[in-house]
Amino acid sequence: MTIKVGDKLPEAKFRVMTAEGPQVKTTDDIFKGKKVALFAVPGAYTGTCHKMHLPSIFLNAYAIKDKGVNSIAIVSVNDAFVMNAWKRDTDQRDEATFLADGNAEFTKAIGMELDASGNGLGIRSHRYSMLVDDGVVKKLNLEPAPGKVEVSGGDTLLGQL
């Protein structure tokens, strides 16, 4: 079942890189008691994700936070080491938390898995943006095609705040 507006996010675990190495963070750690702008991408460093989606998030990050959003998170079905390298390479280290969903646990639990095996990428996440308030989905923008950023970018979510 695909998650929809009004649904509570299911319990899942992410990995986030810290100075001590990868640390487990739960859905509650990330979303409980907070308003979070969540952006999902099919893969770190992939063309559309790196050249289009990520810039749309960072160009709008301050404005999104100015509208009362506590934090911005970016999730991908990648490991914590790849997500940390991607975060470091963006030079936007403090604007967003990069969440590794390495086994697609969260992605599958919300029904957003994408089979990209035909491109040698295995199971990935659909591209979407989501506004989550205290663990409840308030806005959801699912991209109709993985190679485009038409409704899932930072500008769209900003316009909905």
Label every model-predicted segment.
Residues 1-161:
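Chalcogenol-based redox active-site neighborhoods
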